[in-house]
Every structure is written in structure tokens, then in C-alpha cells.
From Swiss-Prot:
Role description: Mediates electron flow from quinones to the NapAB complex.
Organism listed in the record: Cereibacter sphaeroides (strain ATCC 17023 / DSM 158 / JCM 6121 / CCUG 31486 / LMG 2827 / NBRC 12203 / NCIMB 8253 / ATH 2.4.1.)
Gene3D superfamilies hit by this protein: Di-heme elbow motif domain
Cell inner membrane as UniProt keyword: yes
Stated name of the protein: Cytochrome c-type protein NapC
């Protein structure tokens, strides 16, 4: 059976456009199409990079976001607020795209109800936290450095403990990064028994710093990371 003439013509144009359309028209069409695609892509990208989008799922709204609202990152004397994307999405475009690709699997978690109840969330909290700590360790706390920079720190305005640790372990020593010490600053910590909390001062500094205890203590952790 022969195709109608208009379908045959459409197929010919689609498979060999240069035979029917001028190079200028094709170039202009490609440019316009590219602009529309790029504009639509970036619009969608920015729409998924907002606090409203992050908290549109009840898993986030009822658990981690509610915890964030009780921290200094959400309400503070300066009025500068860090939202979900500030801490979980890098600002540089290439790093942002890579993070979006990583986060796509979280959509499956939502669809299959991995943490759709408080009980499920608490049961998975340590696993989720360790995954995020490992990610921030691997990228040298890239999202923290969206706002914080050790070269811009005024150590004279920090506590003696914070100034000493920042100077020795961020300025003078390689291999350390923000998340090594500053866990639990925006969300509650999971059960840390048997796990190195990271907030204890390094062994070579403990003798010279105020003692917050040698075992895990939630209030001690909050006091330490607040510095």
C-alpha cells in the first residue's frame, strides 16, 4: 500500500532536509530550536533547584525540612538563610548537572515508598546520612564552600578552639574538610553509637581544648559544631 503523497513528502523532507530547504533556513531553524531547548532546559533545572520543589514530597517536608527550621542555618541574627539547594546542590553548572543525575534515583525511592513513613525514615537515617557524609567528603565539602571559605575567615572572631582547629586542619593540613567535624548542623544526627562522630577534636589537640567528653553526646556535638 502506497503512503499518501503528503506523508511521502514529509518523510523526504525529514530524511533529507537540505534537498528541500535552504542552508540559511536550516541554520536559522537550528538556532531558534537550540535557544528554545536551552531555555526550557534551564527553566526546568532551576525549577527543581528550589526549596519549594525539594519539600514538595512529604518525606522531606515532615522529616528533614522540619529539623532544618530549628537550626541557625534557617533562622539567625544576620537573616541569611541556607535552603535545601544551598547545601545539597553545587553552584557550578557541571557539578550541578552531575548532582542532579545522582539525585534522580531519589525519585525511585519516592515512588517505591522507601522512606514514606517516619518509622522507615528513622530506620534508614544512618544509611542516608553516611551516604551524604561520604559525598561531601569526596567533593571536599563543595556545597559548604558555596558560602564558607577558610581564606575569608577572621580567626580572631572565632573561639580559641575553632580558630586553632580551622588553622591547623583547613589551612595547614591537607585531607580534612568541613564535613569531617560539622555533621548534624542542619539535621538531627542518627544513632551514632559505634560510629566516629567526627565532631570530637583530633587526638593531638584534645589535651589543649575544652573537654566535651570522649563518648558521643548530642549536646556536646551541637556545642562543638556551633563553633
Amino acid at each position: 500500500m502506497r503512503l499518501p503523497s503528503f506523508l511521502r513528502r514529509f518523510w523526504s523532507i525529514a530524511t533529507s532536509p537540505s534537498s528541500f530547504l535552504s542552508v540559511g533556513f536550516l541554520t536559522l531553524g537550528g538556532f531558534v530550536g537550540g535557544v528554545l531547548f536551552w531555555g526550557g532546559f534551564n527553566t526546568a533545572l532551576e525549577a527543581t533547584n528550589t526549596e519549594a520543589f525539594c519539600t514538595s514530597c512529604h518525606e522531606m517536608q515532615s522529616n528533614v525540612f522540619e529539623e532544618l527550621t530549628r537550626t541557625v542555618h534557617y533562622t539567625n541574627r544576620s537573616g541569611v538563610r541556607a535552603g535545601c539547594p544551598d547545601c545539597h546542590v553545587p553552584h557550578e553548572w557541571t557539578d550541578k548537572i552531575a548532582r542532579k543525575m545522582q539525585a534522580s534515583k531519589e525519585v525511585w525511592g519516592h515512588l517505591f515508598g522507601t522512606i514514606d513513613t517516619r518509622r522507615k525514615f528513622l530506620d534508614n537515617r544512618l544509611r542516608l546520612a553516611e551516604h551524604e557524609w561520604a559525598r561531601l567528603k569526596a567533593n571536599d565539602s563543595l556545597e559548604c564552600r558555596n558560602c564558607h571559605s577558610e581564606v575569608a575567615m577572621d580567626f580572631t572572631r572565632q573561639t580559641d578552639r575553632a580558630a586553632q582547629i580551622h588553622t591547623q586542619y583547613l589551612i595547614q593540613t591537607e585531607g580534612y574538610t568541613c564535613i569531617d567535624c560539622h555533621k548534624g548542623i542542619a539535621h538531627e544526627l542518627p544513632d551514632m553509637r559505634g560510629i566516629d562522630p567526627g565532631w570530637l577534636p583530633p587526638a593531638d589537640l584534645r589535651a589543649s581544648l575544652p573537654d566535651h567528653g570522649s563518648s558521643f553526646d548530642l549536646e556536646g556535638a551541637r556545642a562543638y559544631v556551633a563553633d
